[in-house]
Amino acid sequence: MKPTSAFLSLLVLAFASGSAFAQNPVPPVWHQPTYSDIYCAGFIADKPLESGLFVVTGEEGGLKAIYSAGDTIFLSRGAGNIVNPGGEYMVLRASTDPVPQEFFKGQKEMLRSLGTLYKEVGRIRVNIVHEKTATANVMNSCGEIQAGDIAIPFNQKPAPKFLSAGFDRFAPPSGKNEGLIVTGREFLNTLGTGDKVYLNIGASKGVEVGQSYRIYRTFLPGVKDPSRMYATGYVPEYAGKERMNYKLTDYQKRALPRDVIGEIVILWVEGRTATGYITMATTEIYSGDQVELK
């Protein structure tokens, strides 16, 4: 075969392969939350939690400052407050965002108004109840347990029965339980499949554990999507007499269909907030993206 013919054959084959790939996009893959996802997700409480029980110190005479699974810790209360050994507790820590900048306009005020964000840092079991303290073993840890972390009675969380009903990128609005992603776990604002997120809707709006929500994005207002912020006021550029880009009018933006970019399953619900798990994403998800019940 002549070199030119061989090259043309390869070119045709590459084109055919590319066309086949374009016509058969990879279907979305859904992820199921694990035990760790469910019990380490955190939540936003309407009011600060009041608990006189907290971690005082740990083994090694207090020389150890952080604790994890398998370690022994000492709690602030004993007989009279903790009845019997064997009780299990969830260890929590109130959390604030160390970054002062907002990811979208009004994010900081929204977080403040919704309540206090708590990290779930571990699960412990009381082994010995002393007169004024208690000794406990760290069963599971989601991070570093530290002195001062509070402990509340452990409650089993229902595992969401997640069932995918298929994915429609341009699904029409359901009009149900509309809200938005306020922020992600550890205050992440750029998110993807497997990340935990906090929503600004909760039990008062009918949100329940196990519900599936669509994540979607519209062309308006657009300022909640950093990748589109550049397009909110630019002037079309020209190369000679050829226009290189196009500025959409607000009317045109409103006429365009919204883009469904992922799905969430609800892990936990408080009065005005909910914790969700991103089961699927077709692109990067951002704080400020909107959600609705499927």
PLM features: residue spans?
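Bacterial N-terminal signal peptides that target proteins for export
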Residues: 1-8
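Surface-exposed, polar/charged interaction patches used for macromolecular assembly or partner binding
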Residues: 2, 20-294
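Cleavable N-terminal signal peptides
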Residues: 9-10, 20
